[in-house]
Amino acid sequence: LCRDRFGEKPLFFLKESNELYFGSEIKFIRCLLDKKLNIDLKKLENFLKFGYKYIHKNNKSYYKNIYSVPSGSFLKITNNNIEEFKYWKIKSEIIDIDEKTYFQDLREKLFASIKLRLRSDFPIAFHLSGGIDSNSLAFIAKKYFNYNLKTFSIIGTDPKYDESKMINFASKQLGADHTNLSIDVKKINFLNILKKQIKYHDSPVTTINSLLNYTLYKKIKKDGFKVSITGIGSDEIFSGYYDHHLLYLNEIKDMKNLYEQSCANWGRIVNPVVRNPFLKKMKLYINNPMFRKHIYQFDNFKKDLFLNDKSPNFIE
């Protein structure tokens, strides 16, 4: 039983007596069993304690005895024995090349990736925000591959998060056929959306963004698109979170010149736009290296965690 290299396609399995059940959805396994599944309360408890960054620490599902096959792996099943083998993993190595070459390699790989994803039998929609990630993808598709852009954006009512000015500017510069979807969060029944998403995924919803994106995807589908491209994931690749900057400062604290220069850049460029009061502290990880231990240390975590009301660890 084999899963693709990156785990793009879900694959779950259940071994019961002399039978093996597997499928891309847990609800499919439930239909084959024709009986009720039991929720793994420990898995659910850990999700509530540690958040979505915990859920991929192991291959357990939210149902007892149902597991996912890890990405790039296959299972060998013989009688009552299940063996797991890793057939592929990312190879990484540090290559000493100059900065210009790094940028050129990155540019070539990004362009090749976009070109590959534009190769589709169906028209493709683009998500467009006020940020650099989605704008870069749309710009490359338009300028370098002459793609006829159809873009979609969510526009909220809270002025603190209103990116409509940048979105409208970008869509005009791109010459895109653009649609703004205005959302008033006070008028949306998020509980109904939440129930639907939990039913679809057979698991809790990880972030609030998925609730908003659900309404955007409905609009995209209504307009005749089956495929869309977003800038989601760029922050993980290019250290786009403030935590990454603070962890970096902690790593270079003994390199005096670089540390002082980086601290000056942080204070001048980054700090003014940080809203989280904890992440505004430049020496956060220097003074408290275990600040985010709930993300990467969980086996011996305190069981009375919920008693620590308003813990800074859970300010995201």
PLM features: what roles do these ranges have?
Residues 1-201, 213:
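Cysteine-centered catalytic environments shared across enzyme families
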Residues 79, 172-316:
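Glycine-rich active-site loop/lid subdomains used to bind and stabilize high-energy intermediates
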